Amino acid sequence: VKGQLPCGVVFFVGYLFDGIRTNSGRGKHFSSVKTPQLFIFHFVTYSVLNLFTFLSSYDKIITYMFVNTFKLLSFLAFKLLIMKGSFCMPITEILERNAREFGNDVALVEVNPEIRETRRVTWKEYELIEPNPVCHYRREITWSVFNEKANRFANLLLSRGVKKGDKVGILLMNCLEWLPIYFGILKTGALAVPLNFRYTPEEIKYCLDLAEVDILVFGPEFIGRVEEIADEISKNRLLFYVGENCPSFAEHYDRLTANCASTTPYIELTDEDDAAIYFSSGTTGFPKAILHNHESLMHAARVEQNHHGQTKEDVFLCIPPLYHTGAKMHWFGSLISGSKAVLLKGVKPEFILDTVSREKCTIVWLLVPWAQDILDAIDSGEVTLSKYELSQWRLMHIGAQPVPPSLIARWKKVFPNHKYDTNYGLSESIGPGCVHLGMDNIDKVGAIGKAGFGWKVKIVDDKGNTVKRGEVGELCVKGPGVMTCYYRDPKATAETLKDGWLFTGDMAQEDEDGFIYLVDRKKDVIISGGENLYPVQIEDFLRSHDAIRDVAVIGLPDQRLGEIAAAIIELKPDHPCTEEEIMAFCQKLPRYKRPHKIIFADIPRNPTGKIEKPKLRKIYCGESLVAKQNHG
């Protein structure tokens, strides 16, 4: 005992120092802790832990028991404090914790590789997610490797002069590198700026300039598009390439990060620090840069776990693209619980069911068309459920578009044991969850639900006054996830943010039980298969056709996609044109922007010259579009 006593003292002091350093913000994040609970909690916990370690240093078995017991209690209390919002911290700290607590556990799995772009053309044919039909492909990383990759990229950025407040763009398809790159950016204090993988070269340049991006990280699918603008965009920024066969105008991400330290950079982060910029477009079609801080990101993680109850044993299947706030913020539930997530590159029913079966997925986030395709494939015999192990699948939830009640009724007949939830949100509200249905309210399918965890909602008239229950007004939300502003657009910010309330542009009404239903859209946006289409972009393109005098693009209800773009076209006199000719002309557009329906008719305009789209919707829809979808 005498010989081991000095070792015990050293062990005690070392544990105490390490506990305070690593679990209380490493001594550099105290400014982000709004209350002293975090410091006190870890100090006391590790003091007791180290006391037992010291007292039992002569007995390895007792040491093992006490150390691991208090580690477990520390972890459980830590999670409880996060869920109750007792203290705040940057989202990067959760990754650090996972690397310490669950280092050898699988964090991310990528199933099926992406389609490689040859040059400039094939990207126009992209669906929402594209699989490679040639071969099955799978790779994975653990939490410790995830954190190590994030640290290496962070240290690379710092070595290139990136500092707090700089911006780093991400132009990647879903892949195993995406999230470590995102977190590497956050660890430097820089802002992550995800870009839509469907952007044209002109849109990429516009967004890089608008957000004042300093570095762009891009993948092989974007070589053609980036090459077109490389001379312009590389003058004031660095280009990093992720993948094989690095083009000459960029630097190779893998080679650069391989030589960087894997240790965590000590950069002070607070809740109020800017964290990310996401892009959204208004009715003009020009992207707006949406600025969020670290508090927004952390709140998104709390919301997701509170709504869906993720535990360490859950496995989340993520299919939509990670540049969306929706996909990433739903994944934050896996992050905060330390559980596994699977990135699937394919939307065919057999792909989804096979992945759920192989990876033992318990939570699946779908869009309406994918859920419909699964049910149709089951009904037609295209897939046989008995081939798959699906008993662990507990929750299916849908967001990004109105959900027909008939779809969920069909789903529950096939999967009666599944919980179901609807999530409503905007990029301006850090994605899904500011309003949600709730897993126990399936009788209210068709509604978007009630205020989410930590959120407030109200419905107002044109003067900003709260309307009576049952009356239609504009939906407004307020909470820690509301954007800071539209970056470099104070006018749009002032129109959207008022006294902390985010005016969504969606018209809604509340029923007698307090559940909110969307009625129509104030904003002129079409949501097709979960993706936003901006009519003005399609209209501007169609107006370049020699035979077209005037055009208006509206959304029409579609059972599978929710909405489809319909072009009402007024032809010039003596310029005959057929639907087939218009469709052929539209092949120049990316596939997702092409109108699904062509209608030849006069375009009504009001006295000020504005197209009367409400009148067109009434003519061709018969009722407000969202209400019609809700009745599906």
Name the predicted role of every residue range.
Residues 199, 216-218, 356, 364, ...:
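AMP-binding/adenylate-forming catalytic core of the ANL superfamily
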Residues 103-106, 258-279, 286, 309-315:
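Conserved pre-ATP/AMP-binding loop-to-beta segment of ANL
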Residues 83-87, 96, 104-175, 179-183, ...:
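Conserved AMP-binding/adenylate-forming core of the ANL superfamily
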Residues 336, 361-366, 375-443, 456:
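Gly/Ser/Thr-rich phosphate-binding loop
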Residues 298-315, 323-363, 377-378, 383:
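Conserved AMP-binding/adenylation subdomain of ANL enzymes
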